[in-house]
């Protein structure tokens, strides 16, 4: 008999529902147990994030530099540009729509009236370095490894990257539902749940429409460059889109994406190079979601949204997304450091970001992999021979 298994999205949603349902029922002593766990887990996240940035970004830059063929550089640059366009499109849409959907300062008002359950104890786990220090160190090491012929340091960082992957996949991701449950439980206990849940529903609706618009834009550009019908190109990629909706994994969708990309007239060698690479480095859908969710939470807190601050955040987020691990929730985990250092997000805001992001994980993944087909069409226009 096949064992029934709930996916990460299902576990996150279940954790939120249970937390918000039980917050007004469970005694304070029980709620404080989960608040204590959340405090410890948040400290661990704060410790691991700088290591995550160094462990992912440095070897990613080194790999790109060592394999610096023209097609690789062109694909990487195109993926970064597509990610930035998606991020800025999300910013413009959110800035125009969210103020009419979200009550400014709703979260701050709820927090002011809240009576949070205090943890039984806390343990401070100081990070080894700040997030910006980690980013600068990652750039220096990555560029250095790309220009130094030795393989020893590169081998060390490949092993370090594998340790980070396993820490995310075996420790952080499995504990996320419990972390989200604790956050939702405390929000319901303190009376903040209803305001936040109402906003969540509105945000998800906007992001769903926005990710469709981004795909249409990408294929219009690809069709214009390749002199092809963009709607036909997009229609042929629908099997990859729906496969990604089901699997929530860019890597698992590669065979379908590859097949449909070739069916779109892309040279098999070009498709075989671009599709697996973009499954790792092209995260337009993920960037779209992170920017929109961040702006929604900032509005809920009554924080003034400054374009220059958000522009810097999107530019840095694009770099982090190129190096994000290909595991469920990997993109948002990689983005936590930038959210904290550039937007000032604390533990509760980061937990809300994780919950929102993973609740829509299939939309983002589908947008990412379907967009890979558009990038392949563009690259094929210049490198098909």
Predicted region positions:
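Helix-loop-helix junctions within the multi-pass membrane cores of secondary transporters/permeases
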Residues: 243-321, 376, 383
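Hydrophobic alpha-helical segments of integral membrane proteins
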Residues: 30-45, 153-171, 196-200, 204, ...
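Juxtamembrane helix-boundary/capping and inter-helix hinge elements in multi-pass membrane proteins
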Residues: 27, 62-70, 99, 146-151, ...
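Signature of multi-pass transmembrane helix bundles
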Residues: 2-26, 39-48, 70-232
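Transmembrane alpha-helical segments and their short flanking loops
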Residues: 291-385
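Membrane-interface alpha-helices at helix entry/exit sites of multi-pass transporters
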Residues: 69-75, 166-173, 263-279, 305-308, ...
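Membrane-water interface of transmembrane alpha-helices in multipass transporters/channels
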Residues: 33, 73, 193-201, 226-238, ...
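Hydrophobic transmembrane alpha-helical segments of multi-pass transport and channel proteins
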Residues: 44, 80, 84-88, 208-212, ...
């Amino acid at each position: 008999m096949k064992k029934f298994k709930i996916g990460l999205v299902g576990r996150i949603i279940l954790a939120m529902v249970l937390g918000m349902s039980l917050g007004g029922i469970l005694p304070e002593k029980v709620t404080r147990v989960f608040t204590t766990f959340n405090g410890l887990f948040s400290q661990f996240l704060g410790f691991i994030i700088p290591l995550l940035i160094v462990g992912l970004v440095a070897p990613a830059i080194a790999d790109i530099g060592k394999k610096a063929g023209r097609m690789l550089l062109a694909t990487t640059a195109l993926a970064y540009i597509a990610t930035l366009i998606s991020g800025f499109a999300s910013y413009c849409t959110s800035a125009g729509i969210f103020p009419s959907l979200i009550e400014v300062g709703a979260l701050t008002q709820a927090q002011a009236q809240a009576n949070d359950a205090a943890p039984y104890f806390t343990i401070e786990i100081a990070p080894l370095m700040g997030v910006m220090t980690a980013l600068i160190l990652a750039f220096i090491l990555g560029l250095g490894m790309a220009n130094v012929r030795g393989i020893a340091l590169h081998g060390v960082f490949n092993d370090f990257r594998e340790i980070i992957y396993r820490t995310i996949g075996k420790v952080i991701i499995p504990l996320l539902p419990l972390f989200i449950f604790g956050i939702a439980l405390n929000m319901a206990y303190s009376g903040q749940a209803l305001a936040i849940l109402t906003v969540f529903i509105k945000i998800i609706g906007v992001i769903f429409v926005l990710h469709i618009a981004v795909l249409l834009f990408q294929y219009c550009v690809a069709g214009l460059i390749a002199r092809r019908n963009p709607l036909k190109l997009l229609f042929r990629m629908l099997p990859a889109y729906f496969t990604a909706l089901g699997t929530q994994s860019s890597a698992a969708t590669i065979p379908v994406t590859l097949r449909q990309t070739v069916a779109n007239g892309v040279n098999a060698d070009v498709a075989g190079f671009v599709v697996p690479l973009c499954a790792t480095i092209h995260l337009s859908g993920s960037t779209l979601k992170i920017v929109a969710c961040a702006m929604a939470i900032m509005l809920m807190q009554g924080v003034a949204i400054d374009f220059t601050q958000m522009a810097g955040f999107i530019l840095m987020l694009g770099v982090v997304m190129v190096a994000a691990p290909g595991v469920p929730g990997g993109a948002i985990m990689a983005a936590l450091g930038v959210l904290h250092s550039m937007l000032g997000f604390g533990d509760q805001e980061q937990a809300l970001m994780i919950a929102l992001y993973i609740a829509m994980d299939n939309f983002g993944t589908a947008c990412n992999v379907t967009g890979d087909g558009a990038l392949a069409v563009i690259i094929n226009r210049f490198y098909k021979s």
